[in-house]
């Protein structure tokens, strides 16, 4: 860059006062102003003032009544663009011999793959596994070989196989034959495993529903880790966990959790004594349990979304195999301890057994009725009605007979009619009861699960009076058998809590059936059979 030279004249011009070289400021007023004083400054800061009027009042458009009432002309063609000839039917007839446009013929041609006979074209699809791939993004050559089969060929193959493998029962006769076939297949002897030909059965036992223990609802309790105490192991730990109990509790902050209780040494001795004496419990004894762990709980039952049915099997020597339903699944995860705060929960659970009340007996009878009662279908009901009508017509014909036969048959007809009325009443009561059970089944099950985990108001009142006890002692193990009979004609049951057994197959609640109720059910069955 060339140097800049400043002359003396330029220096003098630079040191001249500004008043000589500044021009007067132009006024914003067109006319000549007499006084040239400028306006004074604003004495206060600017402020935002709210605009009190609607901003859309000058731009908003509202149609008048004349514009609303005016009917605009709709200018369309008379055929609305659809040319339909109703007189000449040959108008829309397609000529099969018409020549297609060359562009359309090209679209309708089938794709014919030219034979690749040249040696160079055969090497294009060859994949060499030891050679480095030059394409890092494409996933086309990730396999050792390229399938030349078209994907269009395999469309619908899985659906076709599904239809061939599964039998679709479209009518009632095919359903009946399929059901009868299941009974025939059950009579066939099992000679080998269905998928392992070399595996042969050692013993074959029939599988039946557990009518004896079905009245007791069972739950599967799943722990995230082994709940056994650290200081015990082996048979002692299994014995302690088989007598364990879970109970819902609430801390000082109002948070709910599940407490895992283990029996104390004195309780273990009492349970061992009861087992040796072949009795469930001593009526006057009190069993103590101490808290061992705290868990967060997650319950799923039939009312929950995505529930899967679960069953467990009970093997009884010389009797067979029985299955029962696990209608509730409880997942327990360890409760996190607060930072810097040591858990000070030192609870003691006191259990004393009592007889079952009417509400619990009714719940057991309802579960038993779900397993035993059979609701007839519409066709069966119609057949029963026709049979009753025919029986009524035969009664009228018999009444027209001789007086001696009439006198002899009156007692029989009156007895059969009374039995029919009783049977109809029993069926009506069973239907109404089953309908009510189905409608309130979900709500009752959810309430029962909450009551069994966190207790009920009746239990809290009984604990306050120290007269009643907890309802439920769980027995763990899928093959654990609890056969009990009535002692002294009274009913006694274990408590109502869910099982805290570590075995995944579930728990059994032992309960004793009443002989008088069994006799009543047998008499009602006899009445229905007499119909």
UniProtKB/Swiss-Prot annotation:
Name the segments for region: Disordered. Answer: 1-23, 361-531
GO CC, alphabetical: Cdc73/Paf1 complex; cytoplasm; fibrillar center; intracellular membrane-bounded organelle; membrane; nucleoplasm
User: Biased composition, Basic and acidic residues: where in the chain?
Assistant: 361-374, 399-434, 442-453
Question: Which keywords fit this entry according to its UniProt record?
Answer: Coiled coil, Isopeptide bond, Nucleus, Phosphoprotein, Transcription, Transcription regulation, Tumor suppressor, Ubl conjugation, Wnt signaling pathway
Q: For the region Interaction with PINT87aa, give the residue spans.
A: 150-300
Is Electron transport among this UniProt entry's keywords?
A: no
**GO:BP terms for this protein?**
cellular response to lipopolysaccharide; endodermal cell fate commitment; mRNA 3'-end processing; negative regulation of myeloid cell differentiation; negative regulation of transcription by RNA polymerase II; positive regulation of cell cycle G1/S phase transition; positive regulation of transcription by RNA polymerase II; protein localization to nucleus
The coiled-coil segments of this chain are 352-400
Cite the location of the cross-link Glycyl lysine isopeptide (Lys-Gly) (interchain with G-Cter in SUMO2) from the record: 133, 154
Q: Where in the cell is it found?
A: Nucleus
Protein name, UniProt field: RNA polymerase II-associated factor 1 homolog
Q: Which organism is it from?
A: Homo sapiens (Human)
Write the gene name: PAF1
């Amino acid at each position: 860059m060339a140097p800049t030279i400043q002359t003396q004249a330029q220096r003098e011009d630079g040191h001249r006062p500004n008043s000589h070289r500044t021009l007067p400021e132009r006024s914003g007023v067109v006319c000549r102003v007499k006084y040239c004083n400028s306006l004074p400054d604003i004495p206060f800061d600017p402020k935002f003032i709210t605009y009190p009027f609607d901003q859309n009042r000058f731009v908003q458009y509202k149609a008048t009544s004349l514009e609303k009432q005016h009917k605009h002309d709709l200018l369309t063609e008379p055929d609305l663009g659809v040319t339909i000839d109703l007189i000449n039917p040959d108008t829309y007839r397609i000529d099969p011999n018409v020549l297609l446009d060359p562009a359309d013929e090209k679209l309708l041609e089938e794709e014919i793959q030219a034979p690749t006979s040249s040696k160079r074209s055969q090497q294009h699809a060859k994949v060499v596994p030891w050679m480095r791939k030059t394409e890092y993004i494409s996933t086309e050559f990730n396999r050792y070989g390229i399938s030349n089969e078209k994907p269009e060929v395999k469309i619908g193959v899985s659906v076709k196989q599904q239809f061939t493998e599964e039998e679709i029962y479209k009518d009632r006769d095919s359903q009946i034959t399929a059901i009868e076939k299941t009974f025939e297949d059950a009579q066939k002897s099992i000679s080998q495993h269905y998928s392992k030909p070399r595996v042969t059965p050692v013993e074959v036992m029939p599988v039946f529903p557990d009518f004896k223990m079905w009245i007791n609802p069972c739950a599967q309790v799943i722990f995230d880790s082994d709940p056994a105490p650290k200081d015990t192991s082996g048979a002692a730990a299994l014995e302690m966990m088989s007598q364990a109990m879970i109970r819902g509790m609430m801390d000082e902050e109002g948070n709910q959790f599940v407490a895992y209780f283990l029996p104390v040494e004195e309780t273990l001795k009492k349970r061992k004594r009861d087992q040796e004496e072949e009795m469930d419990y001593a009526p006057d004894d009190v069993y103590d349990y101490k808290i061992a762990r705290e868990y967060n709980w997650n319950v799923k039952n039939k009312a929950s979304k995505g529930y899967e049915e679960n069953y467990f099997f009970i093997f009884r020597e010389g009797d067979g195999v029985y299955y029962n339903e696990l209608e509730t699944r409880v997942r327990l995860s360890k409760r996190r301890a607060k930072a810097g705060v040591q858990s000070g929960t030192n609870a003691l659970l006191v259990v004393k057994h009592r007889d079952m009340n009417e509400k619990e007996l009714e719940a057991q009878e309802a579960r038993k009725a779900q397993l035993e009662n059979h609701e007839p279908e519409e066709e069966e009901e119609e057949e029963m009605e026709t049979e009753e009508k025919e029986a009524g017509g035969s009664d009228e014909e018999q009444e027209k007979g001789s007086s001696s036969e009439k006198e002899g048959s009156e007692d029989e007809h009156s007895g059969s009619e009374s039995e029919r009325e009783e049977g109809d009443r029993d069926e009506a009561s069973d239907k109404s009861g089953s309908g009510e059970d189905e409608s309130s089944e979900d709500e009752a099950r959810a309430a029962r699960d909450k009551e069994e985990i966190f207790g009920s108001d009746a239990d809290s009142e009984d604990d306050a009076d120290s007269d009643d006890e907890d309802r439920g002692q769980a027995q763990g193990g899928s093959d654990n058998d609890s056969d009990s009979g009535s002692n002294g004609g009274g009913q006694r049951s274990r408590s109502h809590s869910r099982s805290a057994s570590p075995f995944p197959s579930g728990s059994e609640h032992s309960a004793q059936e009443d002989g008088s109720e069994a006799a009543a059910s047998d008499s009602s069955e006899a009445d229905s059979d007499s119909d």
